[in-house]
């Protein structure tokens, strides 16, 4: 049996902070160990359990790679300057991580959580950027269906949480960073009122920031 991989992102929708993409690569025979450990979609886990699992995933013989996508790069994609759109940016990051794994050896299959409601379209974007051959399974909700994608979602979410906690030490408690969070909105309003513009960690192309300017 060969190596299999799962890839997922965390933080696509917030108005503050980066998006994090993680890929977890395991020998196929190790995937049941992840399942037995309780690995599943990060959204179904408590913060404490997610932290413990993120540390345990490498201990069973799986490797992890992470890419942090900063707000400036996200804004550039949303404007259609660096990429066609945010999905195109995400496909490029997925492909970058898969190519890194392929450079280290053969990979049987990569399972990915598609941000595009048409997964085949997202798969084609990723495949066009690959430098080697690998079977791709792209599905909506893959983090709930495939243990290996659940592992990637855990690593991505935990990595992003660590970054957000560090940012809060600099900027203060801005809540979850999502536009639906009253604490985040209050932070945004107070920051713009005081500084006249969004903070450096803002995704300035988000509608909420445009409304506040």
UniProtKB/Swiss-Prot annotation:
Please state where this protein is localized.
Cytoplasm
> Which cofactors?
Mn(2+); Mg(2+)
What does UniProt give as GO cellular component? cytoplasm; ribonuclease H2 complex
Residues that, per the record, bind a divalent metal cation: 8-9, 113
Q: What class of enzyme is it?
A: hydrolase
- Note whether Nuclease occurs among the keywords: yes
Please state the Enzyme Commission number of this protein.
3.1.26.4
- The protein's superkingdom reads Archaea
Keyword field: Cytoplasm, Endonuclease, Hydrolase, Manganese, Metal-binding, Nuclease
| Family matches, as InterPro entries | RNase_H2_suA, RNase_HII/HIII, RNase_HII/HIII_dom, RNase_HII_arc, RNase_HII_hlx-loop-hlx_cap_dom, RNaseH-like_sf, RNaseH_sf
- Gene Ontology annotations of biological process type: DNA replication, removal of RNA primer; mismatch repair
Keyword Metal-binding applies: yes
Start and end residues of each RNase H type-2 domain: 2-213
Q: Which residues form a coiled coil?
A: none
- Cofactor comment in the record? Manganese or magnesium. Binds 1 divalent metal ion per monomer in the absence of substrate. May bind a second metal ion after substrate binding.
- Name the catalysed reactions: Endonucleolytic cleavage to 5'-phosphomonoester
Q: Name one Pfam family in it.
A: RNase_HII
Q: Which GO terms describe its molecular function?
A: manganese ion binding; RNA binding; RNA-DNA hybrid ribonuclease activity
What job does the chain carry out?
Endonuclease that specifically degrades the RNA of RNA-DNA hybrids.
- Membership in a protein family: Belongs to the RNase HII family.
NCBIfam families per the record?
Answer: ribonuclease HII
Could you identify this protein by its name? Ribonuclease HII
The protein's gene is named rnhB
């Amino acid at each position: 049996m060969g190596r299999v991989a799962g890839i997922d992102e965390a933080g696509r929708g917030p108005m503050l902070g980066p998006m994090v993409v993680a890929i977890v690569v395991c020998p196929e025979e190790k995937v049941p160990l992840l399942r037995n450990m309780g690995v599943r979609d990060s959204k179904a886990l408590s913060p404490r359990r997610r932290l413990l699992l993120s540390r345990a995933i490498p201990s069973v013989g799986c490797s992890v790679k992470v890419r942090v996508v900063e707000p400036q790069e996200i804004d550039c994609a949303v404007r259609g300057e660096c990429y066609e759109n945010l999905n195109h940016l995400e496909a490029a990051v997925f492909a970058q991580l898969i190519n890194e794994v392929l450079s280290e050896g053969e990979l049987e299959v990569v399972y990915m959580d598609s941000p595009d409601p048409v997964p085949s379209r997202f798969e084609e974007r990723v495949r066009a950027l690959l430098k080697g051959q690998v079977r791709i399974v792209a599905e909506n909700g893959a983090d709930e269906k495939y243990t290996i994608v659940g592992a990637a979602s855990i690593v991505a979410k935990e990595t992003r949480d660590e970054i957000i906690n560090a940012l809060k030490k600099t900027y203060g408690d801005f809540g979850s960073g999502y536009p639906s969070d009253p604490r985040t909105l209050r932070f945004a309003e107070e920051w713009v009122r005081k500084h006249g513009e969004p903070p450096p960690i803002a995704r300035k192309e988000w509608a909420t920031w445009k409304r506040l300017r």
